[in-house]
Amino acid sequence: MTEYLSVSALTKYIKYKFDQDPHLQSVLIKGELSNFKKHSSGHLYFNVKDKESVISAMMFKGNASKLGFEPKEGDEVLIEARVSVYERRGNYQIYVNKMQLDGIGNLYQKLELLKKKLKKEGYFNQSNKKLIPKYPKKIAVLTASTGAAIRDIHSTINNRYPLVEQIQISTLVQGTQARQDIIEKIQYADSLDVDTIIVGRGGGSIEDLWNFNEEDVVKTIFNCQTPIISAVGHETDFTLSDFVADVRAATPTQAAVIATPDQYELLQQIKQYEYTLSRYIKQYIEHQKKQLNHISSYYKFKQPSLLYDQQIQKRDELERQLNHLLNTKVEKSKHHLKLLQQSFNFKNLNQQITQEKQSIYQLHSRLSKIMSNNITNLKTVLKNKLESLNNLSPTNTMLRGYAIVNKDNEVVTSTHKLNENDQISLTMKDGSVDATVKKVRCNDE
């Protein structure tokens, strides 16, 4: 009698065959993700396809949590899985254990992971950035010895700020040996006592620029004591070196612009400073001239004796007061002596007279000494003031042969204020002279 199998029995048998085949327990598959879904449980359901075929796939939550990227529709992936049968539907499918992006996608995945790691460790913090010197004396340029990058940097620096010294350090920027060469050249440039380092190269694919994403290159830039400008690739290219550098330039040309001031802008600033300073000096000189003219016209400087007449009079008054005080004291003493003579016996009179004479003599000596000291001090003070005033006096200056030149009742302080045939007046120590200017000679001509 013929025996028929149930659908379930056949499906279980086929599943048993799949599960027992060692070649199906670990297969490596390359394909594109499609119909991707993430279940609320954390499991992933999707298809893996190529141009000719499609296979169903699922990935349990435990394995999905270990992925280094977020899978999405259209990703090209490399998968490690086992092949089995889903009994309920009778479909064969793959159960994915590991999955990673294929090719360039894998590089982007690696880049993103390293970027997150370095950012978390503080390598990209703004507080670690160093300022780029405004007026550098030396700039080290690290790039390939040939190519557009080095030409653009050198020509831009020469046009903007030719005073700076450029130190070209030929550096490998692509290939297996470039990573170590970049590290060594940055360390070498840091030892040269330059003001700024430019690290750059032209554009390229992510593979071409990858050396500037290497972790040890990033850390070398971070540890550099000299400010670094990163100019790797074109404006749309970003590397980890850009994030860790003190400044990121979109292109090598922009790096040269950031590193140097514009000589033409500096010249304009210098001219503006020169104009401002010149105007200030002229204003200051004019103010001082006005002050001098004002002081020179003061009436006491025209008659210096007016400055010390009061002091002389005050000294004479003090002298009269001292003499009067002395005479008054002497008269009082004489009167007192007379009273004593009348009050005491004649026998004691000589003794009393002698004592009074001594007292009067001592008093007279003290008063004379006080008066002499006061008069001497006053004479010294007066003499010093007279000497100071005479030194400032225009009259004293004229006694040495100088004359004051006046034109239209104003003091002439410069030959630039005179012209031929001008009528002038020369004031001397004993009078004045009217004269006519025949010729003007200036020292600066």
From Swiss-Prot:
Q: Which Pfam families match?
A: Exonuc_VII_L, tRNA_anti_2
Classification via CDD domains: ExoVII_LU_OBF
Q: Which domain of life is it from?
A: Bacteria
Q: Where's it mainly located? A: cytoplasm
Q: What class of enzyme is it?
A: hydrolase
What's one GO MF term for it? nucleic acid binding
Q: Which reaction does it catalyse?
A: Exonucleolytic cleavage in either 5'- to 3'- or 3'- to 5'-direction to yield nucleoside 5'-phosphates
Where is it located?
Cytoplasm
Q: Which UniProt keywords apply?
A: Cytoplasm, Exonuclease, Hydrolase, Nuclease
One of the record's GO cellular component terms = exodeoxyribonuclease VII complex
Is Nuclease set as a keyword in this record?
A: yes
Per the record's keyword annotation, is Cytoplasm included, yes or no? Answer: yes
Quaternary structure, from the entry = Heterooligomer composed of large and small subunits.
Function in brief: Bidirectionally degrades single-stranded DNA into large acid-insoluble oligonucleotides, which are then degraded further into small acid-soluble oligonucleotides.
PANTHER family from the entry? EXODEOXYRIBONUCLEASE 7 LARGE SUBUNIT
What is the recorded name of this protein?
Exodeoxyribonuclease 7 large subunit
